[in-house]
């Protein structure tokens, strides 16, 4: 390896110069290639056949992993190898043409780079050029006296080596190879003496056209490739063969290439650049037709493969046409054999079909090259056809899309189109100019005309986009260059150019501010004649502050209330544009008074200075010349000021300085407190940190200065879904009071710089809510915008564990004020968060704004807040690795080993956050004692939760859910055991959040223990000097673990852990503890950054050695100490339990009785049978509500409890129960009903039990089959076949004929069973005893609401019909409500009377609480029909239709074709009711009113028998009414009247009662006189019925029966 590295390094230095890679980089590259299997040995690097695969693999690695170092090194090495090879090829060709031998192209190996070659001369004495010989000597090996050639024979005689024709003056052979790969003219011919065959013994090759001497190279086993791909995906397979440069030897390439290619095609697709690169690399060397076709079968589907075969044939026809025109074409073997044809190129000629060895021997090198090139071109065409790219003409840059992403999509689409390569670049540039965003289009139009390629355009746009406004470094540099001349000119004019004769600098005039004279000499000096003028400095009369000469006695005011520090945080660079244009008449120089508020003595408490105003600087800087020497200064975290003349060292005032600006009239502006910077500048400068507080304003050419609290480079762009079209939701109307509050809040946010005016095409509504304090809060409904966003992943998986803070370390808690409003929103995303401020009655155009900071309610705001704050704090974490800094959203907790270190770190954190633009609430800075953070109170040694109430209020399921969530938050700190959480978990069952819940006794008792635990329990802070211990134990309803210190002696818990809720039917305690130990170890590493030092296991593991396999797996890699001891006292609250490792169940028979169990869902029985002597003993258990699995489990449990102290064999045909019993071999936690049943039975046994599973209904003879059959027959025995038939039909819904045969019942009984099924009978029969209609007036009403559009706006009609008389009452309503239903019934009662019962559908207006109460007050029974089934309301539905037809006819008769006027609706509705109630309908001789007020008295008909549920016929009934499919019968003894289906009624011939009838037959008759369907013995009744029919007693359709 070292020799190869040395050779390659020498070649790189020769051909690459200064850019050559180092030996270390070359070695790393070679190691990677060998590791990836791309090189079998380092010497293979000299083979050109391996270059393209290496390039493809390293390119893919660079694209996927982003690691391009090895690719860069390989590019330099490849260039050197190619250059060396080109020189050697040229040299060998020159030797051949000059008759000096040659023809061999050797790889650039060590011998061809380092060994010089002797000069060779031509026999005639002509010398080859010295330069060529010397350069050729670098790469050519030393030649012997007789040069050897490989693969190149004599042109005249064909002799391979040593012929006398070598120096003949003949023309060189055509098609001499001179490129990346050598000439293939001699491939396939017999090797010479110098031929080398790598990886195998040398064997002679066959002559072209003769397959008999083919040596049989290493070829591709494509059958195995396809078999493995079909079974296991992409395998490691043999590869096709290529031609080595050493000669015509066929050797296999690296097998991983075909695996990588198949995987790439499957994942990336055919059009992927990675796929194309790998295919081109694989086919860079000639391939056999056998290998080409099989390769395409592997990577292409059936359809693409068919396309490829056609395309390949077309390409091969092109090659044949070219070979036909040119006899010396390489495919024809340069004229030394038969011409090529399609069969040869496809491998279908004689000796080639299915014979890769024959193809390798018979095909010429030129044919192989043509075959491979044609296959590659065909693959490119298939890729375009199989996976067409999207139309590039439809691609447009999105509003929030970056130019790079747009360029990626456009270039990919253009390159995948059918455009010719020469037209792609102009098309891409034209799309850049037309399809990009308007600002990008302007940049491109302004670009120089010399930019002619897409790459140049992209680079130009990206370079121009780097120029960002406000906070970019370019603005800082521009301000620096602009401020410095201004400062220097002013200071030079003031100081250097205005010195007196004595050399002292003269001050400015106090009156006019101009230099060159004193105040006393000022021509603008006021006349001091105003005795009422008072001095603001000395409080004297007769002069003002500018005329006052007292300097040290009483100058200025002391700091007092009302003074404030600068409101604007300061960034490291200016955040506003330079203000060069002044909007006021003030001069740029102002007079300032500085007062030191410190307590230490100084010579001068106050000084006057001149400062530069409106400079655009971020901070106030006092020149060291103006700063008193005895005023103390301190060093700062950032020791330099950037933007003021480049970089200037600075310090900061230790004391707070009071700064005031003196106005022209001598008055003093409101003083301001700040800590100014002190630097070596030639003039003091007032920055933004004090100008705003002084009431001054920065101005610029654009307008009002804009201040963002955090630099824009910290803004994180949002990710939008592909279809993020703008969302526009109109602003909701707001009352005037809320609109005023909204306007005030918007103005406030605008002044704070949180929003800006907008013209966005997005809009979502805003509103205000009143807070408890009475003020309003602004809210923005961003749900529609959030639906377009791609949510960010969680960057913080949970809250930090506070007990991990080192014990005794002092703490400090900081709170970031308005954290969201301190973080800017990316500029390209702001337009999506626009809103509208409306005006009342649209009196003025609406004002529109958009957020510049993170809006509250945006789904990504919390994540961005965490990321930005974490990015600001990251330098401090690196600078202070020992500082514990806990960051969760906008809360920070700092912990240091000392108070001084904590204070220093806290000040540095505060300064860093303030410089970044965040605001720290001073009143929320907490220091010990009594620090609270994330709902916990922290002391120097403990962490305790706060906020538990005495007793929560529980009313709904949602209340329980919130309470359980709070308890889950507290469990790691309090160690609440599972037994106390059980009562609350029980109340979580349900799906309706509003489902009622009660605060029951179990919950109350558990809550009392939790509250008591919260007053005594707390976590202890971790002591790094003591070992970290962990312990686990089983307890009631689960397991519990703890991380702490001194657990066995003086317990100090640091974190509690609990087992999860079981997810399987049964979980063994051993598995529960195993999972808890794994969880405990992971929590220790995650929380404390270290593994547990000591692990305490239950004492049962000490008795059971070696440890169980599950425990050993949980302890894998554990290097600490393991101790098995009794349960520590810290677990007493959890009530620990002993863990038994005893095996209770086995799958092998045990000596003891054998019992058989079975259960049946049809009989709802479970049975246990066992043999005692010649007879079988049976025990049964029945439960109609249990499932078959539960019945099986109960049967097995009953069998286990037959002999609790005796080993028992339980045989069952239930695989479910058998598998569960085997899993319950050891004690564990059940979670299903069946598991609880079995666990209860096993816990009562003391002997071993064996569970044996047999297949039911098997024909295998023997004891087990016999016993299982007995149990099965007993379980399925049915004493009541009719019940069995019902159960069978309920399960399978089979027809009556199959049901009759299966259950051995009559056909009539089977039909009845089917008809009672609501799923199989489309018109289900009503049960006997339910009266579908009244036998007389006012017995049963039917009511319904129907919609009549003609009656709009009160288009709902409430309709009630009396089921006996057919009388109708209708009322009109606007909506369907309970009040409307009650009003309608009151009207109907007033017209018809009070009914006994009313039948309706199950609409909410009829089933509401108020309607039920109304009906109860009136004493009316109420029933509902089948939901969604109109047949239960047949009479009222027909009445609805009849009423609507009558309304339509009456309306059209009055000329109202569509809508009826409201004034006419009441009259028309009354006319319709009159026509329906007071006139006969159909063939009836009585009107509904007559039937209602003069009803017919029903008489009893002939005696009948009815069939009851048992199938028997019951006597004692007389028929009253015979309807359509139903009959009303009356019991002669009890006078009970019921309706029964007509098929269940037959005459009772034992009774000869006469049928009497009064005036007329019942109106309930079905319209026919022969309503009695039986017997001649009732001829008198039939004659009477016939006479009634002649009198016209028929009924209308409304009176028909419901059936």
Swiss-Prot record:
Organism of origin: Rous sarcoma virus subgroup B (strain Schmidt-Ruppin)
Segments forming domain Peptidase A2: 609-690
Matching PROSITE patterns: ASP_PROT_RETROV (PS50175), ASP_PROTEASE (PS00141), INTEGRASE (PS50994), INTEGRASE_DBD (PS51027), RNASE_H_1 (PS50879), RT_POL (PS50878), ZF_CCHC (PS50158), ZF_INTEGRASE (PS50876)
Additional note from the record: Reverse transcriptase: Error-prone enzyme that lacks a proof-reading function. High mutations rate is a direct consequence of this characteristic. RT also displays frequent template switching leading to high recombination rate. Recombination mostly occurs between homologous regions of the two copackaged RNA genomes. If these two RNA molecules derive from different viral strains, reverse transcription will give rise to highly recombinated proviral DNAs.
Residues of the site described as Involved in capsid protein dimerization upon acidification: 418, 430
Integrase catalytic domain boundaries: 1333-1496
Record protein name field: Gag-Pol polyprotein
Binding site for Zn(2+): 1289, 1293, 1317, 1320
